Amino acid sequence: MKTNSTAISALVALALTGCNLDSRTKVIRPADRPVAEVSAIAAMKGEQLTEKCSFEKDGYTLLYRRHSPKCEPGVKYPLVLFLHGAGERGNDNTATLVHGVVPICRYAMRHGDAFVVAPQCPSGKKWVDQDWSTQSMRRPETPSAEMAAVMALMRELVATLPVDPTRVYVTGISMGGFGTWDITSRMPGFFAAAMPICGGVDETTAELYRRLPLRFFHGSVDGAVPVGYSRRMDKALADAGIEHGYTEYPNVNHDCWTRTYANDDVLAWLFAQIRGR
C-alpha cells in the first residue's frame, strides 16, 4: 500500500510541507479571512486548489485529487470526501474537478480549511454496482472494487494525515450520490455527516443511518436518477423516527448540485457536524 503525490502549484507545495509537522490533537474552528484573501481564494481554479495523487492497495491503483490546508503544528483538520458522477469517470485525474470540488475547497479555505479528497472512478466502472435507470434498488452485499479502494484510502488518510477523526464528511453527486449512501452504510461510525445529492439508495436500509447526521437533495423532475429514490428514503427515515433533512427542488432536473454547493448555509451545516455529539 502506498500513496504518491505530485504538487502542481506553489500553494499546494507549501500546504504539503506544513501538513506533516505535528499530529497532536487540536480542532481548528471556522475563522473569517481578510477580504483580499477571500477574493484571491474565489479566483482559484481546481488545478490550483488540488494536487494529483494516487493510492495503491492490493494491486489496485486509485487516482485522486487532494486539497491540503497549510497545516499548523498541533492542529487537526476536517476531511471531506467528494464522490463524482458518471460523467467524470476516466484516468486523467482531472475530470473530478468539474463539479463540487472547487466550491467545497473555497468554502473550507474561507473557514479554517480542510483536506478535500476526490477519487476518480475508472471509465465503465461504478462506485456502486447498480442500474441507475431503475426505480428501486437493493444494496449489494459487498462493495465494488472501486468503493473498496476508496474505503481503504479514507482509513489510510485518517491514519497518516493530521485529520480530526471526529470531522470526516462525505458528499457526492449522481453516481457519487449512490456512492455516498453506500460508503456510509459500510463504514458505520467513521463519518461525522453525509450529504448525498441526486443519488439512489435502498430504502430498506434506513436503520443503518440512525446515528448519522444526514441531508440529501434531489430535483423533482430528475431525468437521470429518479427522484423516487430520495422520496422513498425520506419516508423510510421518517417512519423509523430517524432525524434527517431532505430538500427537493421543484422543477429542477438532474443538476441540483450546483445550487446546493453554492449555498454556504448547506456547507456550514456539513462542517459543523462533529461525530459523537
Predicted regions located by residue number:
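A domain-start/cap signature at the N-terminus of enzymes
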Residues: C19-L79, A114, E146, T171, ...
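Gly/Ser-rich "nucleophile elbow"/oxyanion-hole loop immediately N-terminal to the catalytic nucleophile
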Residues: C71, V75, Q130-I173
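The conserved beta1-alpha1 loop
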Residues: L83-H84, H218
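Active-site machinery of serine-nucleophile hydrolases
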Residues: E88-M147
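Alpha-helical scaffolding within the catalytic cores
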Residues: V98-R106, C198-A206, G228
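Primarily recognizes the serine-hydrolase "nucleophile elbow" in alpha/beta-hydrolase
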Residues: V158-T160, T166-L208
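C-terminal catalytic histidine-bearing segment of alpha/beta-hydrolase fold enzymes
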Residues: P213-F217, G223-R277
